[in-house]
Amino acid sequence: MSLNRSEKEAVINEVTSLAAKAQTLVIAEYRGITVADMTKLRVEARSKGVSLSVLKNTLARRAVAGSQFDVVADQMTGPLIYGFSEDAVAAAKVVADFAKTNDKLVIRGGAFAGKALDVNGVKQLANIPTKEVLLAQLCGLLMSPISRTAVVLGALAAKKGEGEPAAA
């Protein structure tokens, strides 16, 4: 079904607004994926804050023109699904995890911070922990010296308490 000019402009505007808010774009070929599998992928993506879209490549190229994702315009050929995410690693994680279990989804590439990513770049990005996990790890690192100091002081107080005679 072809779109008329106003519908195409609406699609371009919607994708342009997605691209403006997103940090990451992942592009994957979905040839041969069943509707049920595609639905699972979309549900998983939605739960992680990733917007997945199947777009005409010419409309996608126009939508990302002039944005940080313009660097992947040459990769936009064939039946592709586009994953935009505001979280730096969410789109890469969702698509890479799904591609591990479904060999019909083939990662083509993507873009992050104005740089084009190849397949390995997307997979490396997917291996980075999420922002929340990194913050939790940082808090753990910051709390570790404090808790160690408290344990040492507690042991020192217990040791000093053992050496003194009990009050009568």
From Swiss-Prot:
<dbReference type="InterPro" id="IPR002363">
    <property type="entry name" value="Ribosomal_uL10_CS_bac"/>
</dbReference>
<keyword id="KW-0694">RNA-binding</keyword>
<dbReference type="InterPro" id="IPR043141">
    <property type="entry name" value="Ribosomal_uL10-like_sf"/>
</dbReference>
<keyword id="KW-0687">Ribonucleoprotein</keyword>
<protein>
    <recommendedName>
        <fullName>Large ribosomal subunit protein uL10</fullName>
    </recommendedName>
</protein>
<dbReference type="Pfam" id="PF00466">
    <property type="entry name" value="Ribosomal_L10"/>
</dbReference>
<dbReference type="InterPro" id="IPR022973">
    <property type="entry name" value="Ribosomal_uL10_bac"/>
</dbReference>
<dbReference type="GO" id="GO:0006412">
    <property type="term" value="P:translation"/>
</dbReference>
<dbReference type="GO" id="GO:0070180">
    <property type="term" value="F:large ribosomal subunit rRNA binding"/>
</dbReference>
<dbReference type="InterPro" id="IPR001790">
    <property type="entry name" value="Ribosomal_uL10"/>
</dbReference>
<comment type="subunit">
    <text>Part of the ribosomal stalk of the 50S ribosomal subunit. The N-terminus interacts with L11 and the large rRNA to form the base of the stalk. The C-terminus forms an elongated spine to which L12 dimers bind in a sequential fashion forming a multimeric L10(L12)X complex.</text>
</comment>
<comment type="function">
    <text>Forms part of the ribosomal stalk, playing a central role in the interaction of the ribosome with GTP-bound translation factors.</text>
</comment>
<dbReference type="InterPro" id="IPR047865">
    <property type="entry name" value="Ribosomal_uL10_bac_type"/>
</dbReference>
<dbReference type="GO" id="GO:0015934">
    <property type="term" value="C:large ribosomal subunit"/>
</dbReference>
<dbReference type="GO" id="GO:0003735">
    <property type="term" value="F:structural constituent of ribosome"/>
</dbReference>
<keyword id="KW-0699">rRNA-binding</keyword>
<comment type="similarity">
    <text>Belongs to the universal ribosomal protein uL10 family.</text>
</comment>
<keyword id="KW-0689">Ribosomal protein</keyword>
